Amino acid sequence: MTIQTNLIENLLFFLNYMELEAVRKSIVSFIKTEVHNRGTTGAVIGVSGGIDSAVMVALAAEALGNEHVFGLILPDSDITPISDVIDATNLCIKLNIEFRKIYINEPKAGFQKILDETENRLLQGNLVARIRMCIMYYYSGLLKKLVLGTSNKTELELGYFTKYGDGGADLLPLGDLYKTNVFELARHLNIPENITNKKSSARLWPGQVTEEELGVSFPLLDGILKRINELYCAVDSKKVYDLDEKIIKDLAEDFPSIDLDSIRGVYKLSRLNRHKVTPPPVCKF
């Protein structure tokens, strides 16, 4: 075992069977309690064919009963691989939940027709994510169910989601689990291998792969994020000159196999995107 592997294991909470069971029970209880306390009839979940939504649907069905979970499969035929649509459909059938499949190309085209043209694929991708959010909340109101988001701790700490898009949700049951742990939980829940073995992607543009985009594998990425939190807790920011550069230097020493540009990129995302997970500032009178 390499020093690098030892470091990752120390930084992350790799979970054994009993710990995964405790996580499962905790999330199931959380969903059940929140849905009951808010007086709603169940949950609406976007089912993408990816690992996060698969775990979310499985846990929601366990918590609420499959009859109280409604799945929405919202592909964009310009971007979404047909394998994702098939995997999402088969998962809903396997879990015996009601679902609808709605291609979002038509509303996307409607927006593009009236908006200024742009080649910026991030803007186009965010538009797609927000169209999905609108559909999710339409059915949330129609069915009197809560929208369960599928964002994990890695995405939340990086801000790797669309504000008021896939980040728009009533509950975030996976929000305290790093992506590495979501993979573990998926295997624990016997999520089909064609989903657990799939390369993660937000599907904001064709060919997008999360790890390739960020330049870091999930175990290392999660290790970096956890280390950033530890470094922030260990210092008094008022007494440390150029804190950002100090933390980047410490991260480079802790993760020598990762190039400095990738470390800077991860750190920059985690700092710049904090606004995504905090409420908009209110002017107090």
Language-model-detected regions and their locations in the chain:
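Catalytic nucleophile loop
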Residues: S53
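Short glycine-rich or small-residue beta-strand-to-loop segments that form or flank ligand, phosphate
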Residues: V44-V47
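Conserved G/P- and acidic residue-centered "switch" motifs that form tight phosphate/ATP-binding loops
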Residues: G50
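ATP/NTP-dependent adenylation/nucleotidyl-transfer catalytic domains that generate, transfer
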Residues: T2-G42, L59-E62, H68-F70, L74-P107, ...
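Catalytic-core regions of hydrolytic enzymes
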Residues: R130
